[in-house]
Structures are given as C-alpha cells and as structure tokens.
Amino acid sequence: MKTVVFAYHDMGCLGIEALLAAGYEISAIFTHTDNPGEKAFYGSVARLAAERGIPVYAPDDVNHPLWVERIAQLSPDVIFSFYYRHLIHDKILQLAPAGAFNLHGSLLPKYRGRAPLNWVLVNGETETGVTLHRMVKRADAGAIVAQLRIAIAPDDIAITLHHKLCHAARQLLEQTLPAIKDGNILEIAQCENEATCFGRRTPEDSFLEWHKSAAVLHNMVRAVADPWPGAFSYVGNQKFTVWSSRVHSHAPAAQPGSVISVAPLLIACGDGALEIVTGQAGGGITMQGSQLAQTLGLVQGSRLNSQPACAARRRTRVLILGVNGFIGNHLTERLLREDHYEVYGLDIGSDAISRFLNHPHFHFVEGDISIHSEWIEYHVKKCDVVLPLVAIATPIEYTRNPLRVFELDFEENLRIIRYCVKYRKRIIFPSTSEVYGMCSDKYFDEDHSNLIVGPVNKPRWIYSVSKQLLDRVIWAYGEKEGLQFTLFRPFNWMGPRLDNLNAARIGSSRAITQLILNLVEGSPIKLIDGGKQKRCFTDIRDGIEALYRIIENAGNRCDGEIINIGNPENEASIEELGEMLLASFEKHPLRHYFPPFAGFRVVESSSYYGKGYQDVEHRKPSIRNARRCLDWEPKIDMQETIDETLDFFLRTVDLTDKPS
C-alpha cells in the first residue's frame, strides 16, 4: 500500500518505522528544517529518510499548488501525518483513496491543537494519551480510529511524559496500521461538546506568576522542564530559570513572590509556597536551590517578579488614532483603569473623551489623520502599541461616498501600517466582520471561511474590500518583515456613545441609533427589506475586555492572529432588535416625554441606501480564536445592552421643550 508521510520529531521517526514494519511502501516524506533556536533533543526524520533511501522534502509551503501536483503524481493510497507542524490542505488529503490519518498526542477530542504534551502538564491533568484519527479540513477533528490512555504520574515532567507517549504510540501503530491496510477499521466520531483546543506555546509563556498557587506554578515547571526552555522569573532585572520544584502546602504567610527561606529556597505563592529545587541564573550552570539563592543575592524577604524591574517601571505607551470614537473612548477608559498604561490619542473631536482630558496619563491632540502625518509618525515611533481606529464604518456612506471611504479607510491606514513596519512597532488593527461578506458558513471562521463580496458595480463592498486588503497587507508584512500584529474583527458592538442622534438624522449611524431616533421623534421605524437580516450583537464592555486582553498579549499568544470578537448567542434580526428596543422604550421612566410609537415600515434597501447596495442575511462569528488566545467569553445579554444603550441616548435629549 503506497503512502506519503508528513512527519517530524521522535513521533515522526517512530511512525515511519512502524509503517515500514507493517509493509507500507513510503513514496515520499515531508518534514521541516530544524529551527536553530530550538533545542533538538529528538530524532531527525530527514536523516532517517536518507538512511532508508526514501525521498524527503522540507518545503516552506507544502500546500502550494506545485507541491499538491507533485504529491498527486505519487498516487498515494493513504496519507499519514506524525507530528507535522503545518495544517495540510484538504486538496492533499483528498488525493488518497483510503484517506489520511494523523497521530495526535492527547485523548481527543480534548486538547486539540498544538503542544498537548505541555498543556496537559500545565493544567495538572492526571491522564492523557495518543489518538490516531482520520484527517479532515478542521485540525484534529476527524473520527477516532484508535486511542491509548496513559497515566500521568505526579513526578512526570515533559520529557518523561514524552517518552511515555512515544511508547504508547508505537503500541497503537503496531496494532492499528495492519487494520488500516486491510480496510478493516472502526471509526468513532468525536463529541464536539467535549472538545477543547489549545494554541502553540512559546518560551515567553512560561513566566512564573507568584500570585498563583504553588501547585499551578509547580505544574508549569514540570511542563517546560529541560530540554524545553524552562519556567522563569526575575530578581530585579536578572532572569533565572527554575528546572525542578516542590510544593509546600503549609508555609508561613507572606506576600506572593517573597523569599521565605534560602535553604531550602522557598518562595511564597498565592496559595502555599514553591521550593526551587534546581535552577539556573541567566546563561550559567544548573545548581541546587540554596546555591542559586546565593548566586542571585537572595535573602529572606527578597522579592521576585514576573518581569524585569525596568519593564515594570515604565508604562506601556498606547497610541489610539480615532480615540474619540466608539471603540476608542471605551478602550481609553479601560486602559486608564490600570496603572501601567500611558494613552496618546488623536481625533477631530473630543466630546466622548472629555472625561479623560485632565487624566495625568492621557495625552490628546485634536486633529485629522490626513493632515497631522508628522505628529502621527513621531508618536508611532514613540509608542509601544498602535491602534488605528479611524474609519468610515456606516453602510450608507459606502454607497454615498465610496471614494472617501477608500481614501480614509485604506490609504490613510496603509500609511500608518508602514510607519509601524518602519519603526518595528506592534499594531492592533481593526478589521471588520464585513470582510466575510456573503459567506455562507454557519459560523464565520477567521482561518477557514471564504471572504465573498458582490460585483464591482455594487459600491457597498468598498469598505469590506478596503479592510480585507489591509488585512492581507498586514499579514504579508508580518510574514516577510516581522511586523508584530493582531487583527481583530468586531461583530456588531453596541452600547452607550455608539454614535449620536445627530448622525442618525442624516442617516450616518448604526442601526440601533437610527431606531432610537425614530422612537424619540415619533417617526416610523424603517425595516430595510423587511428587517429579516440577522446579526450577533455584542456589548461594548465584552468587546473592550477582549481588546484589552489583546493589548496585554499574555505570552505573546495574540501575535500573528486574527480574532473575531462577537457574541454568537446574541443573534437577532433587525426586526427583533426593533421589537426589543420598543419594549424597553415603553418601560423607560422618560417615555412620557416622547411622541407615540409610529409603527414599523418596510422599505427597500435601494430607496434607503441608494443604488449599489447589497445586504448580508446572517453574520455569526466563530470565537474559538478568542477563547484560545484570550481566554475570553462574552457574558452580557443583548437585552441588558439594549436597555443601557437606550437609556444613554434618551438622557442626551434636551427635554426642556418636551411636555411632562
């Protein structure tokens, strides 16, 4: 039976050996070049392939059409993947009549994704395993063919668990590969309700946060012990690594991070204390805890910290362009609530941020991004994080002023992106749910959903494609020039200060503001094309909390990611939104100041938005990236958001001339 193999690491080597022992004919092996920054303690797939006389390749992009064609010419009967690090395109998987199978180091459906070996230890699991499953378009989601369980001992560390997994994988493959060859396998679908997914880990993820419990920190040490990079902390500006540790449940009470004793080296935690059994100062040698304490100059009462002291002293400088806008002013409020941010802002007005103007860590300049280019370039260079939030984002403007939308949303933002590349600054860019366009997926997925827009003669799409092209430019700068970036896609955020009723009067506002204006003025609520279009409405507080976590970027998990920020549970049609808003309006204590409700009126989109408009029937986000990268879930119910948004706008109305 002919096979093509994708393999890396020890698991790749043992998988190849198992295939050969089972009588498979391996036509080619695809692997990776070794990362010079990674400690190579594992077997070489390339060397094994060469010794066995099997053609071996390590392309940068195995999914490139040229490689897909070359694999097709090999005519594999079956495909196997053993710890290959890149997602293999469905076009390749479909080349094998018997299908494609992947070996994964966890008990699927739990711990899908990357580094399951390390994650199970981080999370203190007592059991894991290996799974052979059929490969499908979604990573690690195919039917299970075989599975072996492994107990995790309390003294297991990453390398001992790795050896256990390798031993189990050999057993599993020895039992299962002949059955696959004979076409005699039983497949069990994975239970999606039990699925969990984890992202890649980097050395920076393993800092010890002393406010956590000693048990949690001990698990971190176990998860990344040698030959992995190790858990670390700081004494002042000096970094040190903890290679092994021990939990002390009953220890004297002390401030987390304080040295309780130096022999043994015992550090107070949020709960209990952690004994550093062995460790290493900087680039030195490994030594026992008491010697490490002496080397680091620690005494009883000394304090450790999770980051260098110099980093802790300086506030992170955040540049927000469009700081007076809906997202900008709420984000400013969230950042200033903490004591480690300095916010620099630019906008053409200041009504929404007037409450911050006297704050010592808020610096505002009134100006236009198309004019104040020198100020912007200087502050991009000066700041650590850049959020270019300036955009025309109201649908009526897409058809009314398409060229202005392009000039502001694309051209001006491209200049800012290039400044970030020039000065090597981190950019957090507001993409949009609009980029998905008329995608037919049930859930819009950042990494897999197609971005589908209408024809050129529908100018309504100029906003969507401007944003999409900027997304692609940023991604390319990240790949080719090392730009540190995160793209976030808001899904219908709403709340107080969304826009204003004056904007609604000229049709240049979001849907809920327009509906509130209709109620305030006693005019009919217009339902465009019947108002059956569905959206997932997200409370601004939920959205801002997610955006704040992107800025925090714990363990650099947000770098290079695209993250939907929306609430898939708050799905409603525009008609349903209007009905919920009306019910809230009728119960409001200021209701008697306003005219009677004038009813709903169905209007055609062309008469409201003008020629060249197309609508989208549904827009529901997948939030798996937000869960994985941010540990975030939306919490606020749509009705609460509607009530608070309505109350805010009603209290902005001048009631002096209204009858009481």
Swiss-Prot record:
A Pfam family this chain is assigned to: Epimerase
Entry GO CC: membrane
Gene Ontology biological-process annotations: lipid A biosynthetic process; lipopolysaccharide biosynthetic process; response to antibiotic
Family per record: In the N-terminal section; belongs to the Fmt family. UDP-L-Ara4N formyltransferase subfamily. In the C-terminal section; belongs to the NAD(P)-dependent epimerase/dehydratase family. UDP-glucuronic acid decarboxylase subfamily.
Keywords of the record: Antibiotic resistance, Lipid A biosynthesis, Lipid biosynthesis, Lipid metabolism, Lipopolysaccharide biosynthesis, Multifunctional enzyme, NAD, Oxidoreductase, Transferase
Annotated site residues (Transition state stabilizer) in this chain: N102
Catalytic reactions on record: UDP-alpha-D-glucuronate + NAD(+) = UDP-beta-L-threo-pentopyranos-4-ulose + CO2 + NADH; UDP-4-amino-4-deoxy-beta-L-arabinose + (6R)-10-formyltetrahydrofolate = UDP-4-deoxy-4-formamido-beta-L-arabinose + (6S)-5,6,7,8-tetrahydrofolate + H(+)
Protein name: Bifunctional polymyxin resistance protein ArnA
Native source organism of the sequence: Escherichia coli (strain SMS-3-5 / SECEC)
Binding residues for NAD(+): D347, D368, I369
NCBIfam families on file: PRK06988.1, PRK08125.1, PRK11908.1
Start and end residues of each stretch annotated as Formyltransferase ArnAFT: 1-304
Pathway this chain belongs to: Nucleotide-sugar biosynthesis; UDP-4-deoxy-4-formamido-beta-L-arabinose biosynthesis; UDP-4-deoxy-4-formamido-beta-L-arabinose from UDP-alpha-D-glucuronate: step 1/3; Nucleotide-sugar biosynthesis; UDP-4-deoxy-4-formamido-beta-L-arabinose biosynthesis; UDP-4-deoxy-4-formamido-beta-L-arabinose from UDP-alpha-D-glucuronate: step 3/3; Bacterial outer membrane biogenesis; lipopolysaccharide biosynthesis
Gene that encodes the chain: arnA
Residues that coordinate or bind (6R)-10-formyltetrahydrofolate: H86, L87, I88, R114, V136, K137, R138, A139, D140
Molecular functions per Gene Ontology: carboxy-lyase activity; UDP-4-amino-4-deoxy-L-arabinose formyltransferase activity; UDP-glucuronate dehydrogenase activity
EC number: 2.1.2.13, 1.1.1.305
Region named Dehydrogenase ArnADH: 314-660
Gene3D superfamilies cross-referenced by the UniProt entry: 3.40.50.12230, NAD(P)-binding Rossmann-like Domain
Entry-linked CDD domains: Arna_FMT_C, Arna_like_SDR_e, FMT_core_ArnA_N
Catalytic residues (positions): H104, E434, R619
Bridged cysteine pairs (disulfide): none
Record function comment: Bifunctional enzyme that catalyzes the oxidative decarboxylation of UDP-glucuronic acid (UDP-GlcUA) to UDP-4-keto-arabinose (UDP-Ara4O) and the addition of a formyl group to UDP-4-amino-4-deoxy-L-arabinose (UDP-L-Ara4N) to form UDP-L-4-formamido-arabinose (UDP-L-Ara4FN). The modified arabinose is attached to lipid A and is required for resistance to polymyxin and cationic antimicrobial peptides.
Site-annotated residues for Raises pKa of active site His: D140
Binding site for UDP-alpha-D-glucuronate: 393, 398, 432-433, 460, 492, 526-535, 613
